[in-house]
Amino acid sequence: HTTGLSAGTSIIGKFVLKLDPKFLSKCNKYIDTKINVTGTNGKTTTAGLISHLIEGSGKSVVNNAMGANMLTGVVNALSVSLNPFKKTDYSVIESDEAYLSKIYDKFDADYLLVTNLFRDQLDRYGELETTKRLIQDGINKKPNLKLVLNADDPLVASFEGENKTFYGVENVYYADESLKANTSTEEAFNCPCGKPLMYSKKFYAQQGHYFCTCGYKRPEPKYKAEISLYKEYSVIKVNDENFEVPLVGLFNAYNALGAIALCKELGIENIIDTLPTFKVAFGRSEVKYLNGKHTLIQLIKNPIGANEVLKTVDKDSNILIVINDNYADGRDVSWLWDAEFEFLKNTKHEIVVSGIRANDMALRLKYAGVEKIKIINDIT
């Protein structure tokens, strides 16, 4: 606390582990129910939604809400948030896919929610099967772990565990046709039998209702959703209850559905009243007023996530794209060529690019069909 640093950094965590390597294990006795959230996209938002819903029910919760999700970040969050004189009802820990198993070496676990698995940061994780194996290694260390899984993602649905609960989308309705933009970026997966999976419905990427001629198919979700998308929010109908979500995009509707499913499993009350008051974490569909102007901040870091964000862009707005390649961002920015920045070729105003890899972004926009005169990569 004397450093003045927050739970959003990892510096305190590094100091704490040097002073006491068993710190994480010692935290177990101060928390009643321990929840982890992992997956490629949506971890921070989903974990934030769960924490918000728990707090709205009158229960106490600790979390790493600022998104520091590796081992030192988790230790950091717990060290500045836990009260050693009063037990906390819940911990909600967003966990990096590669660090989940390391966290589970020292930290107990009751629930794990897995959002999705997409190709992401190939320089860190390699292929998707590597990411899946890292998560499965963590699951295997906790035989009593309750899994809350996205049934619409064939990789997520195939995780092995003794206690699995599924959530999924039945239908998606668009209040505005501009929100329904199609993309060609899709992931193709094979059934365990080796044949390509087929789909009766596909919502985005590999998310949908899949099946194989061998009989393998999407598991039946306990929590089934009908999603209605609007320009500034969405409505999710889950088992005859309507939940208003103050977030844009189908990807955020999936995040909210996962949070609702997990909180239902916990027996959390007042979800319908609490959900509309949710405030997002920095950079995740965050709305700010800068110099009096309405500003929407989105995070993109892989093709699938970028495409879903690009679908929501108002083409009449001023656009700034910042691309970095620090370790946490992923060194490999070749994913820019797999994301469909063609969505931006008919924007009204100039597009400003910035960050360490601004030139790469400018080149990508050029090949996406954005007029050269509209691409601004020097704002000095």
Where does each model-flagged region fall?
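Phosphate-binding loop of NTP-binding sites
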Residues: 1-168, 173-189
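Acidic-glycine-rich active-site phosphate/pyrophosphate-binding loop
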Residues: 44-52, 226-240
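Buried hydrophobic packing segments
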Residues: 50, 54, 74-78, 256-266, ...
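Short active-site oxyanion
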Residues: 88-91, 143-147, 293-295, 346-352
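A conserved, hydrophobic alpha-helical segment in the catalytic core
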Residues: 106-119, 206-220, 244-276
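Cys/His-rich short segments
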Residues: 169-235, 246
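Gly/charged, well-structured mid-domain segments that form the phosphate/adenylate-handling core
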Residues: 228-231, 262-300
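Active-site beta-alpha connecting loops in nucleotide-dependent enzymes
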Residues: 281, 299-377
